[in-house]
Every structure is written in structure tokens, then in C-alpha cells.
Amino acid sequence: IAPHPDDETLGCGGTIFKHKRRGDNVYLAIITSVKVIKDQNNNIINFYKDTVTQKSENKKIKKFYNFKKIFYLDHPTTRLDVTPLGDIVKSIDNTIKEIKPEVIYLPSPFDLHTDHHVTVKATLSCTKWFRNKSIKRVLGYEVLSETNFNHHGGNFKPNVYVDISSFLQKKVNAMKIYKTEFKKHPFPRSIEAIKSLAILRGSESGFKAAEGFHLYIDRSDID
């Protein structure tokens, strides 16, 4: 689950490729809209890049990851905090009920962006076992330029690591598809930053490169 396109790649791109290699069906739900939204006076109150560019990037990213399907939930970008929470919860819950996922990845609770905060709150309300029994595990990912810029709140402390040593370059290549979000160092979303974070998480977990996650829920059974 990504508040915005590219969050999934920054947060769990390598892990997505590992799921695909294992033969898992992987879906992407993008919470916010690429549409231009206007008020009654025809003034733009919300926009997300150029819609043509964004749709092109989404098409390319779907093919690159070979997602089973991308769900566009069409909530307004940067305005989730003033959008009725029930509407967001309902759209996420409907998506979960359609695909019945076993594992969900979503942002960490420590990101600065309000869209990320609301996405976490809305998604977690859908993960109660009696609402969606298929869910076994829920993990929070970190997003460069959001998670690492929370200098005064709670800090992201990964307690789950996934070895992405064989998929780090593919993660970088996926991020390059988002041309307007990907820039040269020292921009937070750069090749150097992505690789450096993966190497750091790898050094914490005994891998050459890794992605770190915050474990929200684990309902795994012990055989």
C-alpha cells in the first residue's frame, strides 16, 4: 500500500522482487489520485505532477514489477488529513477484501507526511482479524525523504530485515522510472541514498544489502 506512487519502490522494492521470484501474486494499491481536482470556482485545489507523465510511469512500473493489478483509490494528494477517514478506510477495506492478501506492506508510523500518517491509520483499522482473516503479517517500510526527516518525533527502528542483495540494482532501476521523483545526490531519493540505506540495513542484519521493516502484526502459526 503506497500513499503516493514511488513509495512502494523506496520502501519495499527489493522485497517485491523477492516475492515475485517466489511466485507470489503481488498487488499495488495507490491511495492518492493523479487527477487534477478543482473547486466550484474552477481553481485547482489539488494536483499530483503532470497526469500524463504519472500515468505513463504507473504503466511502466506495473510492467517492471509485473504486478497482478494496481488499484487506484483516487483520494486527493496532500489532503488525506481533511478527507473523511471513513471513506479512505472503506476503499482500502474493499481492496483487501477483493484480493485477500496474506502480507501487507505500508508506511511506517514515523513519517512526516500527513498522507502517510492517514494511510497507516486507515490501513491498520482494516487489519483486525475479524475484518480480514486472510492477513497474516503487516509490515511498515521506510521512505527516504519522509521517514528519515522526522528529527523530533518517534524514530524508525527496524525489527524485521529482508535480504535484497540480489535485487538492489533492480530496485534502483525501478526508482529510475519515476523520473520526476528521482534526482542526483545529495537529493534524498538518489542512487547513492537508496544504495547507502540498503547497505546500512544490510550491515545491521548480516546481508550485503537489506530493507528494514517495522513489524505491526504477525499472526503466523507455529507448526
Predicted feature residues:
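Short, conserved clusters of charged catalytic residues that mark active-site
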Residues: L10-G11, T53, D87
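Conserved SAM-binding loop
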Residues: N58-I61
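Short beta-strand segments at enzyme active-site cores
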Residues: A29, I70-L73
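A short, flexible beta-alpha/helix-coil linker loop
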Residues: V34-V36, H75-T78
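Metal-dependent de-N-acetylase/amidase catalytic core
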Residues: I1, K18, R22, I45-K49, ...
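ATP-dependent adenylation/pyrophosphate-handling site
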Residues: I1-P5, T9-F47
